[in-house]
């Protein structure tokens, strides 16, 4: 399945340059490993697409609502951080 999502220019460029290998998104849509993520560069100042796009294969999905490693109070105090590595 293919999913289209907006990406702000600074993040789009980091993905394009190979520096960013993850997306943090609201889990209000269903995606699975093997799906295709079509990223469309979106400029929030002009509120329009720039025309640049790229496709990436989804290799791993974790939904934070399902994570119960930490107490709710700690999550509310500190939040989550997504760490990318290679």
Regions found by a protein language model. Name each.
Residues 1-86:
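Catalytic phosphate/metal-binding cores of nucleic-acid and nucleotide-processing enzymes, i.e., regions
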